[in-house]
């Protein structure tokens, strides 16, 4: 039975904590938890524990917070737990080869894409921005490469026209634990069937940057609408008006041709702020000026109509 496996869990954010909670709720034997060191957060820069640490301590589990797993003494922490398998979910530290080989069944990882598509740091955002029809989770056997290990189990879900990175994150946080528990059962009873990744199908999901989230009006309206959803809730798509950053929370595509230069404001009314793009028109529906809450285009126009005069260009 997979419940009898001695499991080390390694993870840090809320996404990982949801997986740990599922393991504990289903009766699995978690013998130790690794998570990143407490970090300064908030205006007071007070040291804050990770969501995984908070949950582990609530459940009375041993918690380890090494800065790195490269030092021999930190690797010994793993060895001393005599685990059958190590489950890694958004841990944030590199596992050296020696650590990968310590558990009897190795280390397995929950990755937020259908590998080999979107290896890397931002698979949820990249799948949305590119316009993929579906995404999912892959449970894989870890090796020394970046998301290169053999695939053990996959679960998929559609990407809807309303999905943001936030909603997809929640969907995958539901799928991941299901796939993880199934995979552990298969590993325990010897029925797991590792599948080698097809290197010809590999794509990479590079880490996001705030500068990358700045709206580039030369792109098509369809691309920009996906970008806005992909970067919600972080780092948030934004544009600049009078030297001020304005975040864009929601937009829609108006499938009408225009000869206006990209970035030209075409209309600004209660239906939205309509802007020419490289192909089509983007209708801005919800925006957030610096220091303010998100608001409808209509509410922003009531206070800042001078920002959106038809004929002016956004850069």
UniProtKB/Swiss-Prot annotation:
Protein's UniProt name: Methionyl-tRNA formyltransferase
PANTHER family, per database record: METHIONYL-TRNA FORMYLTRANSFERASE, METHIONYL-TRNA FORMYLTRANSFERASE, MITOCHONDRIAL
Any one GO CC term of the record: cytosol
GO molecular function list: methionyl-tRNA formyltransferase activity
Function: Attaches a formyl group to the free amino group of methionyl-tRNA(fMet). The formyl group appears to play a dual role in the initiator identity of N-formylmethionyl-tRNA by promoting its recognition by IF2 and preventing the misappropriation of this tRNA by the elongation apparatus.
EC number, UniProt record: 2.1.2.9
Keywords linked to the UniProt accession: Protein biosynthesis, Transferase
UniProt family annotation: Belongs to the Fmt family.
Residues that, per the record, bind (6S)-5,6,7,8-tetrahydrofolate: 113-116
Known catalytic reactions: L-methionyl-tRNA(fMet) + (6R)-10-formyltetrahydrofolate = N-formyl-L-methionyl-tRNA(fMet) + (6S)-5,6,7,8-tetrahydrofolate + H(+)
Domain of life: Bacteria
Any coiled-coil regions, as ranges: none
């Amino acid at each position: 039975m997979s419940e009898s496996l001695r499991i080390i869990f390694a993870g840090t954010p809320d996404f990982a904590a949801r997986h740990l909670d599922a393991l504990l709720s289903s009766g699995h034997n978690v013998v130790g938890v690794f998570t990143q060191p407490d970090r300064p957060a908030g205006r007071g820069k007070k040291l804050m524990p990770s969501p995984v640490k908070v949950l582990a301590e609530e459940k009375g589990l041993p918690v380890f917070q090494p800065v790195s797993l490269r030092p021999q003494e930190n690797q010994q922490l793993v060895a001393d737990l005599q685990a059958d398998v190590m489950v890694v979910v958004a841990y944030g530290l590199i596992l050296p080869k020696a650590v990968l080989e310590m558990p009897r069944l190795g280390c397995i990882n929950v990755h937020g894409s259908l590998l080999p598509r979107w290896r890397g740091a931002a698979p949820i955002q990249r799948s949305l921005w590119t316009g993929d029809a579906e995404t999912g989770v892959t449970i894989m056997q870890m090796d020394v490469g970046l998301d290169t290990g053999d695939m053990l189990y996959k679960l998929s879900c559609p990407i809807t026209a309303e999905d943001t990175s936030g909603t997809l994150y929640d969907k995958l946080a539901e799928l991941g634990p299901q796939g993880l528990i199934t995979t552990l059962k298969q590993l325990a009873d010897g029925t797991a069937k590792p599948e080698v990744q097809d290197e010809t199908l590999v794509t990479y999901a590079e880490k996001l940057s705030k500068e990358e989230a700045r709206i580039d009006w030369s792109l098509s309206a369809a691309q920009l609408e996906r970008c806005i959803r992909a970067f919600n809730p972080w780092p948030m798509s934004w544009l600049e008006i009078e030297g001020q950053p304005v975040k864009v929370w929601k937009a829609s595509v108006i499938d009408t041709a225009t000869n206006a230069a990209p970035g030209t404001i075409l209309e600004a009314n209660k239906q939205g702020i309509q802007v020419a793009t490289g192909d089509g028109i983007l209708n801005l529906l919800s925006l957030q000026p610096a220091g303010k809450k998100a608001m409808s285009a209509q509410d922003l126009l009531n206070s800042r109509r001078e920002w959106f005069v038809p004929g002016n260009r956004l850069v």
